[in-house]
Amino acid sequence: MSGKVLALVLLFRTFDQLLSHNRTRPNILMVMTDAFDGRLTFDPGSSVVKLPFITYLQELGVTFLNAYTNSPICCPSRAAMWSGQFVHLTQSWNNYKCLDANVTTWMDLLESNGYRTKRIGKLDYTSGSHSVSVCSNRVEAWTREVQFLLRQEGRPVAQLVGNMSTVRVMRKDWENTDEATRWLRQRAESPQQPFALYLGLNLPHPYKTESLGPTAGGSTFRTSPYWLEKVSSEHVSVPKWLPVAAMHPVDFYSTFTKNCSGSFTQEEITNVRAFYYAMCAEADAMLGQLISALRETRLLGNTVVVFTADHGELAMEHRQFYKMSMFEGSSHVPLLFTGPGLMSGVQVNQLVSLVDIYPTILDIADVSPVGPLSGYSLLSLLANYTSFSGRPHPDWVLSEYHGCNANSSTYMLRSGRWKYLAYADGLSVPPQLFADLSLDKEELHNVVFKFTDVYAHLDKLLRSIVDYPAVSAAVHLYNKKAFVAWSQTLGRNYSQVISNLRWHIDWQKDPSANERAIEKWL
């Protein structure tokens, strides 16, 4: 056999092997929502709002009951999911400072290993991609480290729009869902090559409050009567609040900067919560449109569907809305898988987090990871393998937060029945410890001084995972450098710009004192 003929034979054999391999690998669809409380995906939380397509995933797949974000804010959490690494390793400190644009994600690896890939909608994992708003992201540091308080967010409000026929409230998300649906139908025409599709939704993140100007954050919970009807009003609870004097100092700071330190009527609180649940129902319908497209194109049987979120939403729990907190409403995320070869109707108690998605998807696609990962593959929990060569998942998860609306870097270690919160250098801010979340589900009882042996054990474990005093110091240094770099770009306009940053009501009372506080910090 001539060399040319042999080369052709080997080429066609390799191509045939590739085609055969592709036919055995499943398609992958991930839907990642923004600010979806994971407790709504299982009882008793699931009773408050009808989520038929999440229920469908529950019945046909695997639901993780204890899934957590690795950082309760948009960009850092997504950086963890896309990179498979903890945010302190990638220095993804806030919504401005995240991953480099050329970082290798799990989807990049799928593409280089034969998958047809597509990303649609909200991505938010690279530096500068979320926002360049000077007060909310890039130089948010000064709002948390100088010794005066600022109001950064608008007061949370509920807004009803449209009527019973108004289905598409969040139009941009629906447009992205329509694009993803069209892309799926196109893939059905060439099923030989496996695909991986990612759809990022903005729902159920609250909308911008337009009256606060173009740089406003999201404090409006908007929905229509159509979606509000999906909410069981009798199950919408009014959360208990600690007295202000009993609040942890970091929690009080968050309450103040989120504009929640004033009084709220019971109606205001229940409206915010009910409208938020209705927004979750709208997001569920977008998931449903993609599931329906998979079913209609006969792709569903060979597609792994993943549903998750970057973080949760407090929805007035702990006298707060938004995220940026380690309380369950903010840190607990949904994580559901369904697809060929995976178990059906199973609930898993194992503690997991967003960094675990990276190695899990690569395992499902039979692709090897590149470089060290913080996450662990969950495939053995999804497919009930009797033999599994991967690393066993530890009995802990780590989450950390370094952004705005909190005046200290915060570290959460969930381990067994405990949730341990450490702050800053571990000395200057008192820790918190919550026991048995099934009994203290509202997380109102800090028992750190009651269980000192547990506190000592968990702090030692946390320090073995991350040198959190050193990380806090690195964030502190970054904050100063970021602020100086920003202020230098303003030149003579610095004083005017800084005095007019969004929602600031305190600056004009004593601008000189405020500027001296910043100079002292620097």
Task: Please give the residue ranges for each predicted region.
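Catalytic-site neighborhoods of secreted/periplasmic enzymes
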Residues: A80-E179, W183-E189, E210, A216-P225
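Long, internal low-complexity/basic segments
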Residues: N22-P26, T33, D37-G38, T63, ...
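Active-site-proximal cap/lid insertion segments
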Residues: R23-P26, A35-V48, F148-M170, R185-Q193, ...
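Short, solvent-exposed loop/turn segments at secondary-structure junctions
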Residues: A35-G38, P72-I73, F86-H88, L123-T126, ...
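Short, structured active-site-proximal loop/turn typified by the sulfatase FGly-forming signature C/S-X-P-X-R
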Residues: T41-S77, G84-Q85, E111-K118, V238-P239
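Cleavable N-terminal signal peptides of Sec/SRP-targeted secreted and luminal proteins
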Residues: S2-Q17
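C-terminal cap/loop subdomain of S1 sulfatases and analogous C-terminal strand-loop tails that border
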Residues: H311-E317, V355-Y358, D363-L437, I465, ...
